Curated annotation (Swiss-Prot):
Its EC number is 4.2.1.9. Belongs to the IlvD/Edd family. One of its GO terms (cellular component) is cytosol. The active site is at residue 517. This is Dihydroxy-acid dehydratase. The keyword Iron-sulfur applies. HAMAP family: IlvD (MF_00012).
Length: 613
């Protein structure tokens, strides 16, 4: 039977000093021997998705202590990708994921914590904590801050829903008046919470449900709604139960690697494809799988992408639905229920509720259960009141959206498309693959061929797009923006947004070894692997080269002869695979990250071969 890790610091005469320090933190004599549970918070006033988390850690802590544990809270950093976007700050976003994972490991292992509750929300925080949970493999439950309410405003006598991307697009569109742009800006982000569409933050919080590491409702229940408080209370109670089951009953089934196993990762990517989630989730799932030694890679993602239909269409792929609408339709449990009925779910995986996914769906899928409490929970809706306070309203929809033919969530027979929301493309331009969010691609450009317009940085691409260098039919190529080449693998939301604002959103393609915001839509292909800095073919493209993209057949081809490519490669080998004339300051911290970063097909994690002798 495993020994409590915390006993290392709480038992034995030689630990008198450690116990003295524990006492100074408030631990009482009768507490020694109880499990020490880390409350891993990520409160910050920089990020709307985290601004309301300050007191929620102690909410969890009180429940832990009432259930017989010792709760100790600490915070991680949290970068707001939207605020960091469009300037040098975005270089730090993805590397912050590794720092978060490491900082959780450092705190938990340094103090010998027995288990943890992870309070996350936004883009890199949930993935960083997920990587740490898989790495440490101690009992863990995730509970996120929840989604923001969708913005709403009146334009041309019509109420429309808004989000961050609308503010960015309107601000970049020269045809939009200053007054309208300011109106959209003021209305786009009305409350605390992660941005209101199926962007990276909400996608990842949904995926923790599919992985079995969070409770039903975690991904979709609004940050402002009073019902969300129960998720935090239950997390505090439940983590003590899981901890005692492992350490006192030798039940290893409650550990993250046994909950989030290969089948659970396949369920997570099936959910991601079905809901048209952010392409960043691919990066983060690959990274988490590696931390947990789960054999899950791009081959699995490619296979699943050919099987799973697109069942849920949400902003940025449509402005009709946001996360509050997904919740009203049954949330993640509703989507997983449809995958189950389509035979596309492995429902014998376990969850932090201590039951199988099949049993959990029987209780929480609104199409399977008539439990009034569950139906009431999924009717939790927005209040439309600007606030930074969690649990500040208790509004409810009058009815559920359980229309699986024309509603927000569809059954397989009435899917938005039988082809899923994500696809892996391969070819001589991306030998190890690249990712496109097909949910956001117009049917007219699923097959596309055009001349390349090559840029060595995102900044140059933005200037080129706004300067009129890109024409209808072009393929914009932005390279040396991968994990190593950027470094930091910047998000390319501004280039895609500006293509739309210039009227080219359905007339151009964009290819990069960088990545895209969860707010991106259009023919935007990212994660080209190997990246240019690692000798990838994307580093050999020249302006004017023809590029052929075929999403239905999952291919991407640089239409240049092998002999010409060989000559170009020899030239780049001499030049060292570096961007030409790029003006960018790279700090020592970023250089340290770049020195060990793998390409996107490996999750942009550290190259462990450089650490192992």
């Amino acid at each position: 039977m495993p020994k409590y890790r915390s006993a290392t610091t709480t038992h034995g005469r030689n630990m008198a000093g450690a116990r003295a320090l524990w006492r100074a933190t408030g631990v009482k004599e009768e507490d020694f021997g109880k499990p020490i549970i880390a409350v891993v918070n990520s409160f910050t006033q920089f990020v709307p998705g985290h601004v309301h988390l300050k007191d929620l850690g102690q909410l969890v802590a009180r429940e832990i202590e009432a259930a017989g544990g010792i709760a100790k809270e600490f915070n991680t950093i949290a970068v707001d990708d939207g605020i960091a976007m469009g300037h040098g700050g975005m270089l730090y976003s993805l590397p912050s994921r590794e720092l978060i994972a490491d900082s959780v490991e450092y705190m938990v292992n340094a103090h010998c914590a027995d288990a943890m509750v992870c309070i996350s929300n936004c883009d890199k925080i949930t993935p960083g904590m997920l990587m740490a949970a898989m790495r440490l493999n101690i009992p863990a439950i995730f509970v996120s801050g929840g989604p923001m309410e969708a913005g709403k405003t009146k334009l041309s006598d019509q109420i429309i829903k808004l989000d961050l991307v609308d503010a960015m697009m309107q601000g970049a569109d020269p045809k939009v008046s200053d007054a309208q742009s300011e109106q959209i800006e003021r209305s786009a982000c009305p409350t605390c919470g992660s941005c209101s569409g199926m962007f990276t933050a909400n996608s990842m919080n949904c995926l923790t449900e599919a992985l079995g590491l969070s409770q039903p409702g975690n991904g979709s229940l609004l940050a402002t709604h009073a019902d969300r408080k129960q998720l935090f209370l239950t997390a505090g109670q439940r983590i003590v139960e899981l901890t005692k089951r492992y350490y006192e009953q030798d039940d290893a089934s409650v550990l993250p690697r046994n909950i989030a196993n290969k089948a659970a990762f396949e369920n997570a990517i099936a959910l991601d494809i079905a809901m048209g989630g952010s392409t960043n989730t691919v990066l983060h799932l690959l990274a988490a799988a590696q931390e947990g030694e789960v054999e899950f890679d791009m081959t699995d993602i490619d296979r699943m992408s050919r099987q799973v239909p697109h069942l849920c269409k949400v902003a940025p792929s449509t402005q009709k639905y946001h996360m509050e609408d997904v919740h009203r339709a049954g949330g993640v449990m509703g989507i997983l229920g449809e995958l189950q009925r389509a035979g596309l779910l492995k429902d014998q995986t376990r969850t932090v509720l201590g039951i199988s996914l099949q049993e959990q769906l029987a209780q929480y899928d609104v199409k399977q259960t008539q439990d009034p409490a569950v139906h009431t929970m999924f009717r939790a809706g927005p209040a439309g009141i600007r606030t930074t306070q969690a649990f500040s309203q208790d509004c409810r929809w009058d009815t559920l959206d359980d229309d699986r033919q024309e509603g927000c969530i569809r059954d397989k027979a009435h899917a938005f498309s039988q082809d899923g929301g994500l696809a892996v493309l391969k070819g001589n331009l991306a030998i190890d693959g690249c990712i496109v969010k097909t949910a956001g691609v117009d049917e007219s450009i699923l097959k596309f061929r055009g001349p390349a317009v090559v840029y060595e940085s995102q900044e140059d691409a933005v200037n080129g797009i706004l300067g009129g260098q890109v024409k209808a039919g072009d393929v914009v190529v932005i390279r040396y923006e991968g994990p190593k080449g950027g470094p930091g693998m910047q998000e390319m939301l501004y280039p895609t947004t500006y293509l739309k604002s210039m009227g080219l959103g359905k007339q151009c393609a964009l290819l990069t070894d960088g990545r895209f915001s969860g707010g991106t839509s259009g023919l935007s292909i990212g994660h080209a692997s190997p990246e240019a800095a690692n000798g990838g073919t994307i580093g050999l493209v020249r302006s004017g080269d023809s590029i052929a993209i075929d999403i239905p057949n999952r291919s991407i081809t640089l239409e240049v002869s092998e002999s010409e490519l060989a000559a170009r490669r020899a030239e780049q080998d001499k030049l060292g695979w570096k961007p030409v004339d790029r003006q960018r300051t790279v700090s020592l911290a970023l250089k340290a990250y770049a020195s060990m970063a793998t390409s996107a097909d490996k999750g942009a994690v550290r190259d462990k071969s450089k650490l192992e002798g």
